[in-house]
Amino acid sequence: VDAELLADGKKVFAGNCAACHLGGNNSVLADKTLKKDAIEKYLEGGLTLEAIKYQVNNGKGAMPAWADRLDEDDIEAVSNYVYDQAVNSKW
């Protein structure tokens, strides 16, 4: 994955996602973090970039949909950032 894309994703995450998901955690539902094992267990579609993008776009439960708040480039960037953090156990 492109380093610039991940850097952009980190910025989008800090400005939009960190309020609930700081450090890959979940301040609303403690078990449903952004860590690898939790994503594999709870995210419909598992730990895939497409499943993360779908969740960001459409939301689910307490998580709002971001498709009307972020543009496609920001969603692509933040999804890649979350995926990279989870797959490589960086949270």
UniProtKB/Swiss-Prot annotation:
Molecular function GO labels: electron transfer activity; heme binding; iron ion binding
Modified how: Binds 1 heme c group covalently per subunit.
Keywords assigned: Chloroplast, Electron transport, Heme, Iron, Metal-binding, Photosynthesis, Plastid, Thylakoid, Transport
Gene Ontology biological process terms in this record: photosynthesis
Cellular component per GO, a single term: chloroplast thylakoid lumen
Coiled-coil intervals, chain numbering: none
Gene3D superfamilies reported for this sequence: Cytochrome c-like domain (1.10.760.10)
UniProt keyword Iron, yes or no: yes
Positions of heme c binding: C17, C20, H21, M63
Highest taxon listed in the record's lineage: Eukaryota
Subcellular location: Plastid, Chloroplast thylakoid lumen
Known partners and oligomeric status: Monomer.
Function noted in UniProt: Functions as an electron carrier between membrane-bound cytochrome b6-f and photosystem I in oxygenic photosynthesis.
Family: Belongs to the cytochrome c family. PetJ subfamily.
Protein name: Cytochrome c6
